UniProtKB/Swiss-Prot annotation:
Organism of derivation: Pseudomonas putida (strain ATCC 700007 / DSM 6899 / JCM 31910 / BCRC 17059 / LMG 24140 / F1)
Record NCBIfam families: trpB
Keyword Lyase: yes
Top enzyme category: lyase
SUPFAM superfamilies: Tryptophan synthase beta subunit-like PLP-dependent enzymes
Protein name (Swiss-Prot/TrEMBL): Tryptophan synthase beta chain
Pfam families recorded: PALP (PF00291)
Modified residues (N6-(pyridoxal phosphate)lysine): K95
EC number(s) recorded for this UniProt protein: 4.2.1.20
Cofactor (UniProt): pyridoxal 5'-phosphate
Amino acid sequence: MTQSQYRPGPDANGLFGSFGGRYVAETLMPLVLDLAREYEAAKADPKFLEELAYFQRDYIGRPNPLYFAERLTEHCGGAKIFFKREELNHTGAHKVNNCIGQVLLAKRMGKKRLIAETGAGMHGVATATVAARFGLPCVIYMGATDIERQQANVFRMKLLGAEIVPVTAGTGTLKDAMNEALRDWVTNVEDTFYLIGTVAGPHPYPAMVRDFQSIIGKETRAQLQEKEGRLPDSLVACVGGGSNAMGLFHEFLEEPSVQIIGVEAGGHGVHTDKHAASLNGGVPGVLHGNRTYLLQDQDGQITDAHSISAGLDYPGIGPEHAYLHEVKRVEYVSITDDEALDAFHATCRLEGIIPALESSHALAEAIKRAPKLPKDHLMVVCLSGRGDKDMQTVMNHMAAQEKHA
C-alpha cells in the first residue's frame, strides 16, 4: 500500500476499497447520481468556492485558532498538546462547516426545502441556522430519546424556525432519525435537499461532507507550520460517524510521519453490549446507503449503540474510516463514558474550556498518551464542539455518583 493510495477517492461508484457505495432505493438512485454531478460541477466553479469562502470567514468565523493547551500539557508532563478550536465556530461545533457547503449546493440546485437528521442536536442546530440564513423551510428528524437529553438544542432549533419531528421507532436515537429522514427524501425527491450531518450515507455524501470539513486539517497544517515550523506528530479526534475526524485527518493521510488516532465511544466498555465502537466491536454490513462497519447481532440485525455522548451514539461509522482502519493508516481506539467524563472535568479546570462530551473522548485519549511521549512531540486534538448542550447529562451523572458515594 503506497502512501498515495491513502487518499484514493472514492472511485466513481463511491467506494473506498470495499466500503461506501450507493445502496439506495431505486427511486433515490437518480437523485444521488444527480447530486454527485452537481457537486462535481460546484467544486470546479470558482464562484461557488468564492461564496463558500465568504461564508466560512464572515458567517462561521474561520479560521478558528490552534491553541497551545499549556496547563493540560504541564498536567500530563509529556507531549505538547494543541487544541483545534472548532467549538469557537458559529453554532458551537464543527457541524456548520458542512451545513454551509451543502446549503449553498442546495440553493445552486434550486431545492426549496431542507431535511436533516440529528443526534446531539448540533447538526440540527447548524442545519436550522443555515436554513434561516437562506430562507428555506427545514424539517429535522430527531430520536425521542435524544430529544429528552438535548432539550436546549431542541429549543434552539425551534427558535431558528425548524420543525422537529420526534422519532420513536427503534431506540429513538440517531440511526432511527436517519431512517425517517431517508423516508421523507424518497417521498419528496423533487423539491427537497437531504443535508446529511456526517461522512456516511450513499455516495457522494461521505466524500462531500469530508471535503467541506477538510478545512479543519488545512488550517491546522498552516497554523502549526507558523507556530512550530513543522507537521504535527500525532492527531487525535473523536469518531461517531466521523466527520470532525475526517476533516482533521484528510490533509495528513499522505504524511507518513503523522500518527493518526480516531477515538470511538466505548460506553461501558467494548467487552459489554453498551458501547458505540463500530470498528472495535462491529463487523462490515450495509446501513443508510453505504457499506461500512456496523454493530450487529448474529442475524445481521443492527444493535443499539450506547454512549454518554448523544453525538457518538451511532451503530456505524463513515466508510472512509472503515477503509483507513483496514489499511491500518489510522489507529482506532475506544474511550469509556467514565474516562470521557474525567477528561471533561480536567479540561474545564485546567484550561477554562468546557468541551462537548464527544470531544472529551478525544481529550481522554490525548491525556492517556501524552505522558508517555517526549516533550517535543506535537499532538493536535480536535475540540469538535462546546459542552453547553451536555450540562444536564453531566449534572445527572454527578448526582448519581453522589448518591452511590
